[in-house]
Regions:
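ATP/adenylate-binding site constellation spanning eukaryotic-like Ser/Thr protein kinases
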Residues: 35-38, 56
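Amphipathic alpha-helical hairpins
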Residues: 1-7, 24, 37-42, 49-51
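Glycine-rich loops and low-complexity Gly/Arg-rich segments
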Residues: 30-34, 61-64
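A cross-kingdom feature marking charged/low-complexity
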Residues: 42-64
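Short, well-ordered alpha-helical segments
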Residues: 2-33
Length: 64
């Protein structure tokens, strides 16, 4: 059986890095992560440059 949690993460490098950060942080409190589904992506802009890449994602993991 799998459980799904919704997470928000950000990075100053890329959306890929934000997704990796989301999985790394989630793995500190849940085990058996199987997948991440990116629901939404957003970028914060200042002075015409992207300064933050943000994601809203679902992470699926096995229940013990």
């Amino acid at each position: 059986m799998l459980k799904v949690i919704e997470v928000l993460a950000e990075s100053d490098k890329s959306w890929e890095d934000a997704a990796s950060h989301a999985v790394t942080q989630a793995a500190k409190s849940v085990h058996g992560i199987k997948s991440i589904y990116i629901k939404d992506m957003e970028a914060k802009v200042e002075n015409n440059k992207i300064i933050k890449y943000r994601i809203n994602a679902n992470i699926s993991f096995l229940l013990d």
